[in-house]
Amino acid sequence: RGLGDVYKRQNFDRVVFTEEMRKDYTILCPQMSPIHFDILEPALASCGYNLEVLPSTGECLDYGLKYVNNDACYPSLLVVGQFMQALLSGKYDLNKVALIITQTGGGCRATNYIGFIRRALEKAGMEQIPVISMSAGIEKNPGLDINYKMAVRALQALIYGDVFMRVLYKTRPYEAVPGLSLIHISEPTRLALIS
């Protein structure tokens, strides 16, 4: 067996996220920064996307270890683990769900997240699920339209996230009651302030 045989066996076809899918698919996004991503979710909803940011639980690491090789970095285990935990939970229609992740195109393993995710889906028998690469054109997905409105909303969410994070880090050392600062910038409070 040569390298050519291995290449032929691999399935390099991917499921493209189409405009038709955009209408009724739930797009799952890994939690990478709770303050920022909780604001990003409604920002993208206002642009017509049914985005759901997944919770990061202690159990997601176990799912990541099951579906990713042991040589992968810790963040990639968490990301793949969040996706697989959600998909295997029974909460989602596996024929009406897509996954989204950024793809840098750089030397970091973050570029390989797409491959890790697709491999995990294949191992679990879920190859029909589209994996959307949110990148500067590495992969095309007609159902993801990064237009001016979406870019502005996403940037606003990130800026608000930075503001809330700075407030939290500046006030936390002076808390009279531990955890009070975090309660004051909880998700409902943040969303009420920016809407």
Q: Residues of each region from the PLM?
A:
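An N-terminal assembly and electron-transfer interface module characteristic of large anaerobic redox
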Residues: 1, 5-190, 195
